[in-house]
Amino acid sequence: MPVDPGTMYTATASASIEAARATALTLSPTSNIKGRTFDRFIQIFLENQDFSIAAGDPNLAYLATKGILLNNYYAVTHPSQPNYIAAGGASTHGIIGDGFNRIDAETESIVDLLEAAQVSWSIYQEDMPYSGFQGTYVNQQNGRNDYVRKHNPLVSYDSVGTDVNRLAKTKNFTLFDRDLANDSLPQWMFITPNMTNDGHDSSVTVAGQWARNFLEPLLSNSKFNKDRTLIILTFDESESYLKENRVFTVLLGNATQATRSARLTLNDTTTTA
């Protein structure tokens, strides 16, 4: 029976992980395509928090002083996964839950647009066990959720999830540091912290501390924050399903001008435009 390329890298047994890790293809493409207003774009999702609570976190509030706070940025829906899918392809494509979903290979994602324009891309996923992993992975010491498929914006698209060369650009978060050191970061990036650091299984305090610890040194790193770099730090959805789905969102990087507050109404599909 032929192996389904959309599920061939989902095994989580230790032996399977080690075997796949030893042979997994990893790619770190670069490019220098000039955009209209920015040349590098980084999107980071934190998890499940209402705007007012996130805005009250001291570390997130600090980051807001370094860029532009978007007062009217809305997540698309509930629960988590459709918001990530929308960030990767400008639509939820009918996905309404957090299960193991697959979107037909004929459906375009942001990757198709980027590659057509010869813009390099990668996604960095904290605690993904190896490049191109298609499943969900738990902490091997304590059994906690670490990397989850539902928080990956691209793997559900079969145009990515069944293509070895595209899977090679869906990488463990540790490879971000390597690519940064080698000056081989791409022009488009999506970064997902693990289930603790994004606040999903912890708190907004943990998420805010992680975000500041990660971003603050990068803002002064010339290899990362080049002249036309735009970073969007946001939450996938609000905590409350009964309120409007407004989420704390900050634009950072040298492509922005600090001390301004934006009044545009935006959502997760906007970032693929």
Would you name each region that the model predicts?
Residues 2-273:
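Flexible, surface-exposed loop/gating regions in the mature catalytic domains
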